[in-house]
């Protein structure tokens, strides 16, 4: 194979039913999709998706053997007010902490500093590293270090040629 993996940008929380305009996890699975992105900041903001709904979507996606890229992140106001670490922990705890160890192997966490998406602003490599370490420690608090170390955490903020080397030089990014 080419190593290329397909990902969907969302899926509905129900496997089937009359939900015009929505695409179910089972439809994506039947098309050979490998991953589904859930919890993206735009879906949270514009579609009022909360952690409870995302937990249902996670379960539905996993039931169809899709891997989940679970997004978490904070706005600039949340970062500036100092609640960013607690907010991201809450998003993870409420979205995926109901899963068992085996299910967690199918979760990728995507940290997306909302304030750095499409704004031209970027998180510094230190900010990205701090949050990635925090996310791993949140996961370790429930599942232990071995599981936390095995979870892929990806950076979903603005990454461009001018900052890529600095970001990728960080141990956890």
Where do the PLM segments sit?
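Active-site loop-to-helix "anion-binding N-cap" substructures in soluble metabolic enzymes
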Residues: 1-110, 114-173
């Amino acid at each position: 194979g080419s190593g290329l993996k397909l990902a969907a940008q969302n899926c509905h929380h129900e496997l089937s039913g009359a939900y015009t305009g929505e695409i179910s996890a089972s439809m994506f699975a039947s098309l050979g999709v490998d991953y589904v992105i859930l919890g993206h900041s735009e879906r949270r903001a514009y579609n009022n998706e909360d952690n409870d709904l995302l937990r249902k979507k996670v379960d539905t996606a996993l039931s169809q053997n899709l891997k989940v890229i679970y997004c978490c992140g904070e706005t600039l106001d949340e970062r500036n007010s100092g609640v960013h670490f607690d907010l991201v922990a809450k998003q993870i705890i409420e979205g995926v902490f109901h899963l068992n160890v085996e299910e967690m192997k199918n979760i990728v966490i995507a940290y997306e500093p909302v304030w750095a998406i499409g704004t031209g602003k970027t998180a510094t490599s230190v900010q990205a590293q701090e949050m990635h370490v925090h996310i791993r420690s949140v996961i370790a608090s429930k599942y232990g270090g071995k599981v936390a170390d095995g979870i892929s955490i990806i950076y979903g903020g603005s990454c461009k040629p001018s900052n890529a080397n600095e970001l990728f030089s960080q141990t956890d990014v």
